[in-house]
From Swiss-Prot:
Binding locations of NADPH: 14-15, 35, 107, 141, 256, 280, 282
Primary role: Catalyzes the reduction of the glycolytic intermediate dihydroxyacetone phosphate (DHAP) to sn-glycerol 3-phosphate (G3P), the key precursor for phospholipid synthesis.
Residues binding sn-glycerol 3-phosphate: 107, 137, 139, 192, 245, 255-257
Name of this protein: Glycerol-3-phosphate dehydrogenase [NAD(P)+]
Broad class of where this protein is predominantly found: cytoplasm
Organism name: Desulfovibrio desulfuricans (strain ATCC 27774 / DSM 6949 / MB)
Locations listed in the record: Cytoplasm
Entries under InterPro entries matching the protein: 6-PGluconate_DH-like_C_sf, 6PGD_dom2, G3P_DH_NAD-dep, G3P_DH_NAD-dep_C, G3P_DH_NAD-dep_N, NAD(P)-bd_dom_sf
SUPFAM superfamilies in the cross-refs: 6-phosphogluconate dehydrogenase C-terminal domain-like (SSF48179), NAD(P)-binding Rossmann-fold domains (SSF51735)
Gene expressing this chain: gpsA
Signal peptide (UniProt feature, chain positions): none
GO cellular component, one term: cytosol
GO MF annotations, alphabetized: glycerol-3-phosphate dehydrogenase [NAD(P)+] activity; NAD binding
Length: 332
């Protein structure tokens, strides 16, 4: 296991809080940086995040603060939503140390630029020469706080850094594998959210288990095509950040993106769904970015196109899914 180190988790949402708890339980000196002073005080006094993880106790050694000075720690976990990452980094770059180790825990593709979180970080903090890694995989925050067995993957272009960080994050109920395919791991984490919306829509329409199984399988193939076109390794999508995360988010109702699809399939409007969720469903904006990316890369992406039609063209879910079944027949 790794030596005990000083860590800042940037972002006090459900996943940032869970990772902070995990690292504190591992004996590391951990502070969560967040914007809400009331939530920070509650974490420090009651050892609970009442906004995102109510009723789930946090390790009492986990501290919370609104002081950006903690961003100067040698290891910073970025738990900032993808669409907010660029402006957040630009506004806080002055607090990071040169050579800081950054572990991205967000999932998504930036709209407009179509950049991954790794690319955003390189563009905004390149002058600091940060050491970058990404952590992804099938991992609901609440299950991590309950100490339920979880396995994830941590990717870094620096193989030695990946091996080191997997030791930092791993614990009795949290197993961390390492990889060097940063692109594949980040693409898998982003793409599966689109497929989760599609799977939820199928279930919201009551189309049955056969439909869901077909969608998950063809969704994995689409994820792999898009990822490889973007520079990823195909086999990464058969791992935890691909198939693993896809399976979890397409089948479990704790998934916010699946919830969006379920409610769309039952006839609710997107605006009402997103307003009532209370948390970010990254797949909604990621769908627009992936749809544009597929067009630019000339990659066939029928499921992404279908979800885009439902979200952004107000196409009726039954019509969209009927159109998918009516596509020209082909080899698998």
């Amino acid at each position: 296991m790794a030596d005990k180190i000083s860590v800042c988790v940037a972002g006090g949402g459900s996943w940032g809080t869970a990772l902070g708890h995990l690292l504190a339980r591992g004996g590391h000196d951990v502070s969560i940086w967040l914007r809400d002073d009331a939530v920070a005080r509650t974490i420090n006094r009651k050892h609970e995040n009442p906004r995102y993880l109510p009723g789930l106790p946090l390790d009492p050694r986990l501290a919370a603060t609104t002081d950006p000075a903690v961003l100067a720690r040698p290891l910073v976990v970025l738990a900032v939503p993808c669409q907010q990452l660029r402006p957040w980094l630009a506004g806080h770059a002055c607090h990071f140390q040169p050579g800081v180790t950054l572990v991205n825990a967000a999932k998504g593709i930036e709209t407009g630029s179509l950049a991954t979180c790794a690319e955003i970080t390189a563009q905004e903090l390149g002058g600091l020469n940060p050491r970058y890694a990404v952590l992804s995989g099938p991992s609901f925050a609440a299950d991590v706080l309950r100490d339920l067995p979880t396995a994830v993957v941590l990717a870094s272009y620096d193989e030695a850094l990946g091996r080191y960080l997997r030791g930092v994050f791993s614990g009795p109920a949290f197993r961390c594998y390492s990889s060097t395919d940063v692109v594949g791991v980040e693409m898998g984490g982003a793409l599966k959210n689109v497929m989760a919306i599609a799977a939820g829509t199928c279930d919201g329409l009551g189309l049955g288990a056969n439909s869901r199984a077909a969608l998950v399988t063809r969704g994995l193939a689409e994820m792999s095509r898009l990822g490889v076109a973007r520079g990823a390794q195909a086999h990464t999508f058969m791992g935890l950040s691909g198939l693993g995360d896809l399976t979890l988010t397409c089948t479990d109702d704790l998934s916010r993106n699946r919830q969006v699809g379920l409610r769309l399939g039952r006839g609710e409007k997107l605006e009402h769904i997103t307003q009532s969720l209370g948390m970010v469903a990254e797949g909604v904006k990621t769908t627009a970015a992936i749809h544009e990316m597929a067009q630019k890369l000339q990659v066939e992406a029928p499921l992404t196109r279908a979800v885009y039609g439902i979200l952004y063209k107000e196409m009726a879910p039954p019509t969209v899914l009927s159109d998918l079944m009516a596509r020209d027949l082909r080899e698998e």
